[in-house]
A protein has these predicted regions:
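Flexible beta->alpha loop and helix N-cap segments adjacent to enzyme active/binding sites
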Residues: 1-228
Length: 228
């Protein structure tokens, strides 16, 4: 920042301070690149091309107990998975925590997951809510907490949510809207797409390796849906 200010002053430019609008700064991959990775893993025959993949993911989460990984767009930069390299599940059933831990995370049972919540629904679930797009703030929860119980701290029912807006991530918001339209629940459980002890996946090869080496039910990767 000091360098920026010095150069701006040197060149007669007024320094500008802007709020961070997004942290999806990582790599993205085309459907053709994803198709090549599916071929390399001999998985193309298991993959279904879905035009409206985000609506399909929301429906899967709403109508089954499936744990679904989502690989879409540019990789998140920072310590949290924010929908583009995420593992998603229905947050209303606390039994899903054990399933996720057994399937991929292998974490201690008491370690909490977090929810992604539509910004239009934060008043329903959070006490004194404000938008928190980076999953960095903690909140007490309201009486409607049972909707998202699997994505809360099991001791005090606090939440460290990601709030989702169409401006921030329109595709991920569509997943949540699809899920909400079928369940009435305004959020999903969201945890990072990786096996415990490994970094978050960043490319199609790592995504498919993780699918094959875990008990995930499905992977939405680009416009392809791969089911176990």
């Amino acid at each position: 920042l000091k360098g920026y200010f010095e150069i701006a002053l040197r060149d007669g430019i007024k320094p500008v301070k802007e709020h961070l609008k997004s942290n999806y700064f990582g790599s993205s991959f085309t459907n053709d690149q994803i198709k090549d990775a599916l071929k390399n893993h001999d998985m193309l025959d298991k993959a279904q091309y879905v035009d409206d993949i985000d609506d399909e993911v929301g429906e899967l989460l709403a109508t089954s107990d499936m744990v679904v990984a989502r690989f879409s767009g540019r990789l998140e930069w920072g310590p949290r998975a924010l929908g583009n390299r995420s593992i998603l599940a229905n947050p209303s059933d606390p039994r899903i925590v054990r399933k996720i831990n057994n399937a991929i995370k292998m974490r201690d049972f008491w370690m909490p997951f977090g929810p992604s919540i539509l910004s239009t629904r934060i008043d329903d679930y959070l006490v004194d809510p404000i938008n928190s797009p980076y999953m960095m703030l903690a909140f007490d929860t309201t009486e409607k907490r049972d909707d998202i119980t699997a994505a809360l701290h099991p001791y005090d029912f606090t939440s460290r949510p990601q709030t989702v807006t169409p401006e921030y991530n329109s595709g991920y918001e569509k997943v949540l809207n699809s899920f909400e339209s079928k369940t009435g629940i305004g959020g999903v459980l969201n945890t990072s797409f990786n096996i415990h002890g490994y970094p978050i996946v960043w490319d199609p090869e790592r995504a498919l390796d993780t699918l094959n080496n875990s008990s995930l039910d499905a992977l939405a990767i680009g416009n392809y849906l791969v089911r176990k």
